[in-house]
Amino acid sequence: QGSCTIQARNRFALKDAAAGYDYTTADVPAEKLFGYIAQQIGQIAQPGVVSPLGHTFSFPCQQFALNRAQLIHWTKEIKTSGVEGQDISALLEAALAKANVTNVRPQAVINDTVGTLLAAAYGQPDVDIASICGTGHNTCYLEPKHPLNGQPMIVNMESGNFDEVPQTKHDRTLDEASDRPGFQKLEKMVSGYYLAEVVRTILADLAEQGGYAWGACLTQRQLIQGRDLDNILADKGDLPATKTFMAERLGATECTPELLAAVKTAVTLVATRSARLVAATFAGALLHIDPKLERRHVIAIDGSLYEKMPGYAAMISEGLRGALGVRAAQVSTILAKDGSGVGAAIAAAV
């Protein structure tokens, strides 16, 4: 291991209703999106200092070189025009030049899972799988001997696009209403962007079957937020947080204990299914690279679900035990907070 210094890093939203901007819609061209990114980079770049830039790009790409990747298609309901099929680094380089940020040189563009693996493995040699369990979902792993060249290679699985998992009617409803029906089916069943929407469709069905008037508001997409699920999952006793959610979010001020319990159960089942499906993808990768699980494996995970959703990390561990039995003792998971950004910096430095 060597040492390197990350000169600067920053997070910024691509859409902010309060500030009145959204760079993720179809009427926004690539130039505006990357111009905004270049503007943000310019604000933290050190004047007069040439800085290599590591860029995490969390969407399916065809990689041609460390700093050359072409977007195949958007996911997570992003629709910015003129980006699909284009070289991401070239778009960023053009935007940096236009913004006169000439001292920042894009050196690496990598998937966020790859960045997470690089960051975690830099400090823990047993890390050979990395995953994002947050707004979106994807996993990569270290192939010990890739058939293309016989050398170790990080493989981006794009596991969010796995599509053989049986869907419920609620999954099908969500998928059909999405921007890309039939794509990213697993991601729509496990990721933070969609879990609240799955719960919304379940509650809409519950309201219709029970004749509840509060079901009328559940036609509104994004009505339920991830923090609502977190509060309900952590709720205990008489379920006061669930009662507050029903009153404030859905306008249901008179809820029986049975109804509150049903809502809590629905949220718990959606979260548990997510964690177990994620664990199943981990188990598949593990058994591919080490069929008998003869050595130690560490899975590095970044993302809000793993970090913040109550019980989610434990659910993944339970899912691994269910899939691998006693051999799961060879596997552990760790939080790699901001791993994707740190990993991009490492990729730019080496």
Cite the ranges covered by each PLM segment.
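A short acidic Gly-Thr/Ser loop motif
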Residues: 1, 58, 113-114, 132-136, ...
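ATP-binding/phosphotransfer module of carbohydrate and carboxylate kinases, centering on a glycine-rich
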Residues: 1-22, 28-51, 97, 122-123, ...
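Gly/Thr-rich phosphate-binding beta-strand-loop-beta motif of the actin/hexokinase/Hsp70
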Residues: 1-7, 63, 130-143
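Glycine-rich phosphate-binding loop and adjoining helix at the ATP-binding site
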Residues: 6-42, 50, 61-121, 127-129, ...
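Conserved beta-strand elements of beta-rich interaction domains across eukaryotes
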Residues: 17-19, 58-62, 136-138, 144-146, ...
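Active-site nucleophile and cofactor-binding loops and adjacent substrate-binding regions
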Residues: 79-84, 105-114, 130-133, 188-191, ...
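Acidic, glycine-rich loop-and-beta core segments that form the ion-binding/anion-interacting portion
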Residues: 142, 146-189
